[in-house]
Amino acid sequence: MEAGELARLAEVVGDETFGEFLAELEPSDAAEIVERLSSAEAADVLEAMAPDDAVDVLSRLDPAEVRQILVEMEPVEARELEELLSYPPETAGGRMTPAFVALLPDVRVDQAIVALRKVAAEVETIYYAYVVDEENRLLGVVSMRELVLSPPYRTVGEIMERDVVKVRATADQEEAARLLVEEGLLAVPVVDDEDRLLGIITVDDVADILEREVTEDIERLGGSQPLEMPYSRATPFYLWRRRVGWLLLLF
């Protein structure tokens, strides 16, 4: 579609629906579409996306274009995305979303449930609420099930799980993916070196990481891992050198 048609489509379906559509694409494909929108139009669409999805798209754009889009955004959302962009895309920090629920330990159970109800539509998941102190250091985690089953007069600090599975923001994204799978979790908190809660990574965020990791393992087993260049540009000698070991083994 032409740039004008894309802008018209975004206007007709609404920024939120258009953002959902972009989130389903490969980030590189979504970035190509965003590039054909004006900075203001791109800002509106990216604001409607989940922060982690928006960052995946922005990281594929030219830095000058990213700065222009961020200028057009609401200051709070722009700062959120700038912070996420400060982490390399292959790290846990680059994969996390800041849309999580955090509670102070002295909040009562009934108050916590009311708070969760208010923010449910804005956060990534409400299955877990993270308990932090006044300096945002991670103290524990409480599940929605635990909140519902606990007496309303008890505090979150009394019922929270203190042994929290967490990952550093600088850790490789595959470490976060493995933690989610091995521990059977729906989300894992991301913290800095001082244990301050920065964001969360949910299981759907790492599904593509796990798929890619398994694909690479299977390709390696079959000797068919991708080449460093397109087949159309590979010389016969290069192809022979890459495959001869496996061919000899198969013979």
Place the predicted regions along the sequence by residue.
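Core alpha-helical transmembrane segments of integral membrane proteins
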Residues: 226, 230-251
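Hydrophobic packing positions in regular secondary-structure scaffolds
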Residues: 1-226
